[in-house]
UniProtKB/Swiss-Prot annotation:
It holds the Pfam family Toxin_12. InterPro entries: Huwentoxin-1 (IPR011696). It comes from Chilobrachys guangxiensis (Chinese earth tiger tarantula). It is found in: Secreted. It comes from the Eukaryota. The presence of a 'disulfide through disulfide knot' structurally defines this protein as a knottin. GO terms for molecular function: ion channel inhibitor activity; toxin activity. Disulfide bonds join 2-16, 9-21, 15-29. Belongs to the neurotoxin 10 (Hwtx-1) family. 48 (Jztx-F5) subfamily. This is Jingzhaotoxin F5-21.66. Expressed by the venom gland. SUPFAM superfamilies: omega toxin-like (SSF57059). One of its GO terms (cellular component) is extracellular region. Its main location: secreted.
Length: 35
């Protein structure tokens, strides 16, 4: 199960499609600008 937008994460691979884990605090899945 992937992490949704604003879900806590440690790596981008945990996040759902089009989301990436933020590089700096706070660490959560944010939109990576892709469609």
């Amino acid at each position: 199960e992937c992490k949704k937008l604003f879900g806590g994460c440690t790596t981008s691979s945990e996040c759902c499609a089009h989301l990436g884990c933020k590089q700096k605090w706070p660490f959560y899945c944010a939109w990576d600008w892709s469609f």
